[in-house]
């Protein structure tokens, strides 16, 4: 079985008629059996998709034919299995939500730093290194000596800056995120707040892991990704983490041994946070999942088309067997 190509992509560009792109983009993805989610907004495009190499190449070639979407920023990694269930194109107000009006990376942004130059920058004692990702992402891996803002969502990042960073004190600020898009907005925000020297890792962590040899790397741990792989290691292969189906937090095999872990229902991160009514829904959902597996059907959360196809095949086989007996 050939490897599935997983492609993270984004571009900040003014798309005044972004709504009209949804239908043709979805058609291109569905025609090539590309799965994943892409977000369209007036400020650009963002998302992660997966498919065959030919399918992803075709999608990127299609972008090059669309005004403003040529030379889109993309990073690829690989997986043995399709990491997404569905194909979606969503219309949004922002392609990455910071919640601060007027922040526009198309006008002002920090200085891009190539992966090959990143180690030298963050080894400078005058540089404060800030991880712009959420706390659950940071917990499974980050750069050596990076500051964790301990945010639950990217919306909390501006408040962290206000409370902890000072343009007069922090003369050089370097930031990084998974694929680079959050840093586009975070560096733009810092520039707006009066910070002078603001840097960010071009292409994000994924590009760094792709281009920097592990023996030279300052990355520690694994990188959280927003698909069914949960995390990738330094070789951009699926990591050791799983994901709680209740709260979506990354979990280890050790976590699964704890009494608080119930498959599809709870984990150590959410056992005390889930209301009883919601817990009962999770229990019923997991029961339906197990029943589907016993029937030989696809996961309840899988692509609906796949479930229908599986059921149709079983019906056809049963009908054929009945005809042979008659």
Swiss-Prot record:
The active site is at 177 (cysteine persulfide intermediate). SUPFAM superfamilies: Rhodanese/Cell cycle control phosphatase. It comes from Shewanella denitrificans (strain OS217 / ATCC BAA-1090 / DSM 15013). GO terms for molecular function: oxidoreductase activity, acting on paired donors, with incorporation or reduction of molecular oxygen. Its EC number is 1.14.-.-. This is tRNA uridine(34) hydroxylase. Pfam families: Rhodanese, UPF0176_N. Keywords: Oxidoreductase, tRNA processing. The lineage of its organism: Bacteria, Pseudomonadati, Pseudomonadota, Gammaproteobacteria, Alteromonadales.
